[in-house]
Amino acid sequence: MCVTKASLPMLSPTGSPQEVEVGKILQGKRHGTISPESCAKLYCYYGVIMVLTVAVIALSVALSATKTEQIPVNKTYAACPQNWIGVENKCFYFSEYPSNWTFAQAFCMAQEAQLARFDNQDELNFLMRYKANFDSWIGLHRESSEHPWKWTDNTEYNNTIPIRGEERFAYLNNNGISSTRIYSLRMWICSKLNSYSLHCQTPFFPS
């Protein structure tokens, strides 16, 4: 005999088909008529219930672990500092008052940045649009009118946009890029990469 307790309650005949079947088996047991087939069915039902219970618990644990281990992948770069504007992988700062080129570069360096550099036409378009009508220093300079233009990290400018004038320090105006003397007063723009990685920056100060 597969069940030894005779005090198991009779299940309602209005229950599910599985409950009715188990009830019949138990009822038959009270009358001493449980067949080997009924006994096997009873064990089968209990086995199915146990398997489903274990599966639900395992699934809950797995989902909980997955949520805990998830790492956001949509934040490739760190946020820009307050009052800076993010564009692609860079942060830009637009000054609120004018200064000469030397002070502007020193200010940017204090923010772990450089006077602004643009690497493509889209970045230049953004700078031109956002500076409004203010002439603004950028990071282009040269030793003399006979030397090539360079950025503050000493990489050469590719001359995609011509620079007007014969002076040594460049700034943006409504006509594009022009040059003037170092002590002229202009607004300025700083730029830096906005990733978590540390990037070495060599300060440039004209002699």
UniProtKB/Swiss-Prot annotation:
Residues 1-41 are cytoplasmic. CDD domains: CLECT_NK_receptors_like. Detected in fetal heart, brain, lung, chondrocytes, perichondrium and osteoblasts, and in adult splenocytes, thymocytes, lymph-node cells, osteoblasts, growth plate chondrocytes and skeletal muscle overlying the bone (at protein level). Ubiquitous. Detected in thymus, bone marrow, lung, gut, heart, skeletal muscle, ovary, spleen, ileum, liver and kidney. One of its GO terms (biological process) is negative regulation of osteoclast differentiation. N-glycosylated. Residues 87-202 form the C-type lectin domain. The keyword Glycoprotein applies. Disulfide bonds join 80-91. SMART domains: CLECT. Its main location: membrane. InterPro entries: C-type_lectin-like, C-type_lectin-like/link_sf, C-type_lectin/matrix_domain, CTDL_fold, NKR-like_CTLD. Keywords: Cell membrane, Disulfide bond, Glycoprotein, Lectin, Membrane, Phosphoprotein, Receptor, Signal-anchor, Transmembrane, Transmembrane helix. GO terms for cellular component: external side of plasma membrane; plasma membrane. The keyword Membrane applies. It is found in: Cell membrane. The modification Phosphoserine is found at residues 7, 12. Gene3D superfamilies: Mannose-Binding Protein A, subunit A. GO terms for molecular function: carbohydrate binding; natural killer cell lectin-like receptor binding; transmembrane signaling receptor activity. PANTHER family: C-TYPE LECTIN DOMAIN FAMILY 2 MEMBER D-RELATED, C-TYPE LECTIN DOMAIN-CONTAINING PROTEIN 180. Homodimer; disulfide-linked. This is C-type lectin domain family 2 member D.
